[in-house]
């Protein structure tokens, strides 16, 4: 319970600080990273809770919208999945799994978002726009390659935190 509370509070606080400094520009997904860390350290229920609560709580202060549902549920599911990766110790493997998890999260939330706002567009069109939007602006944005950069930085943060916490816990034992 303590790990879940601390990581949820950290995710919300750092997301709010990131928004205060950089605005809505996404360059690291802090709630998703903390959900993965929670799942890895404390199990599937903790990962799910941190993923769900961190997006809902931070969006209550930043602005709730239909995206809150997508973000919270996708982050919760990724965090829960990380509860089953506790045996993974290799840093490169942790980074790779973090990157793939962040990519899956981004694709799922982009498809859900564009499905909602593109009306009667075909599923193939929605998928094309969602994937393209990870690399080039498609809906009025101005950032290029924001998806891969966000995924890489989120994966780096997650893998470093997991390894460091494991190291500290190992030294304390």
Question: Which role fits each region the language model picked out?
Answer:
Residues 13-30, 52-86, 113:
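Interfacial aromatic-anchored transmembrane helix boundaries in multi-pass membrane proteins
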Residues 1-38, 45-46:
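Hydrophobic transmembrane alpha-helices
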Residues 32-40, 80, 84, 123:
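Short amphipathic alpha-helical patches
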Residues 11-16, 40, 44, 48-51, ...:
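Transmembrane alpha-helical segments of multi-pass membrane transport proteins and ion-pumping complexes
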Residues 6-14, 30, 54-58, 121-122, ...:
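Short amphipathic alpha-helical segments, especially helix-boundary/capping motifs
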Residues 1, 44-49, 88-94:
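Membrane-helix interface segments
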Residues 21-25, 64-69, 84, 88-173:
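Membrane-embedded alpha-helical hairpins and interfacial helices in multi-pass inner-membrane proteins
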Residues 3, 7, 31-32, 36, ...:
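Alpha-helical transmembrane segments of multi-pass membrane proteins, especially transporters
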